[in-house]
Amino acid sequence: SSTSSGSMTAPSPDPRVGLKAGLMDAGEATWNLRVLSRTPSPERFLGVTNSDLAFLGKYAIQGNYNGWQIWDISDPRAPALTTAYFCPASQSDVSVYRNLLFVSGEGLTGRIDCGGQGVREAVSKDRLRGLRIFDITDIRNPRNVGNVQTCRGSHTHTVVVDPRDTENVYVYISGSAGVRAADELPGCSREAPEKDPNSALFRIEVIKVPLAHPERAAIVSSPRIFQDLVDPASHGEAPEDIAAAAKAAAEARARGMFTAELFGAERVIPPQMISPMLDSIVKARNGTGPATAADSAVLRAALPGILAARFGGDDATPGPRPGPTQCHDITVYPAIGMA
């Protein structure tokens, strides 16, 4: 259904209720908007999560977990694909400044060379977790001119223009993944700040990008802006959510998957988090090949402590829990010096 009357009152009953699911044929409902076109992505990007949009003149740049696309939207009723750049990595948020395109990479499988084979090793020189920089002066032939690695990757980022600095642009990075091993990126630490002042927790990264030499982009500051925050009060999960989580955990356990107590409930730990840890255990015993049952048993015993360290301690510790160790998005207002 569609409503475009300009009314400030939401339609009732809610037209979104009961819409059918689908990849390209899902049900739709709009309010005060008109759909001008529906253009599918190229096949390599279909069925893969899309992320952010950025705009440059007549172009829309569409982030996707398999890379990014550039669309000519001069005619919004018939967008034309200009560039499709295959470069898998979550979450591929995009921003553009002049001729530079910035793309976030956070997942464990993203590669520096943009290959689709992923990265299985717990520690690898091929992994990209951080910020990719492309020169899109020739928008049909973008060039990867720089990469900046960070300890927690880049879930999202924000481009910041300092009105007093015309030679550089700055990118604020927020990474929400686990801290990578120091063997992969020296200086990374998942210890609490009181144990290690160089901890990668509770901070963002500020990257300085020289406009004339973007290949020299580098981290220039890591402000610990979340220090001393405490976990906000929570009303807890709804009974149906608790029941669904318990059912999912029981089914996962029956299939041999990993579960652990986290935030007061048994949770399923996703394979993409488990695989690198198993690989590390195999490597620690100088083994090769897939993990054994004994390796899995070692990880199951260690997992509660690993999760407690990564996600803020256990519920038995007295006092308020630590607050978030990262944020999702960063909003800035450079003209008044606020973020």
Question: Positions of the model-derived regions?
Answer:
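Feature marking well-ordered beta-strand scaffolds used for ligand recognition
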Residues: 1-339
